[in-house]
Amino acid sequence: AGLLGQLGASSTITKIRKYSLDLYKDLEKTTGLSTGMKQNGAITVASTKERMQELLRQATTAQLSDVEVEVLNKKRLKELYPVLHSEDIVGGVYMPKDAQADPVGVTNVLAKAAKMEGAKIFEKTPVKKILIKNSRISGVETDKGVIDCEYVVMATGMWSRQLGEEINVSVPLYPNEH
């Protein structure tokens, strides 16, 4: 399942994440499809005082961004998550509106909504180059020919960065092993 946490590394990312949760709910109604989204919350625990201090800073940041957050002591952690082995746990935070969704469901909802607004989606059509004319995107060159367009959505995952570099656009994505 895809995790949909609200708190990001910056206030801008947090706003985008919160917006996405609302967008997915709205698009489910619009498209009649399901994202499989469940807002069951997220708990992060700390096993050291230092980690708990870090979680408290994150909780403060969350509150400043209007993200609902609850700081948890051991007792409250056990209430929320009874199977937790809490002997070595100092505390934690709970974000009740964080969610999870089915990545395939989200993709299908976004694709249908885009098509309803007039977008065309070309699957199995690798883009070789983004074409620029008069400092604007004019199309894409693919292995099946040129497609004229005003807008391009780069949905190439970690390869978006390379594609962006070719047209002097910074896409701050980096592969990360996890």
Put a short name on every predicted segment.
Residues 68, 120, 170:
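Residue-level detector of anion-binding/catalytic polar loops
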Residues 33-44, 58, 65, 78-117, ...:
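Helix-loop-beta segment of a Rossmann-like dinucleotide-binding subdomain
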Residues 35-38, 86-87, 144-146, 155, ...:
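Solvent-exposed alpha-helices and their adjacent loops that cap or buttress functional pockets
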Residues 93-151, 155-162:
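Helical element adjacent to the flavin cofactor pocket in flavoenzyme catalytic cores
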Residues 1-6, 40-44, 158, 166-178:
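Central beta-strand plus flanking loop segment that forms part of the substrate or channel wall
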Residues 1-2, 18-19, 58-60, 85, ...:
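Short, glycine/charged-enriched secondary-structure capping and boundary segments
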Residues 54, 162-163:
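Phosphate- and divalent-cation-binding pockets in alpha/beta enzyme and binding domains
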Residues 2-80:
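Dinucleotide-binding Rossmann-like beta1-alpha1 core, especially the glycine-rich loop
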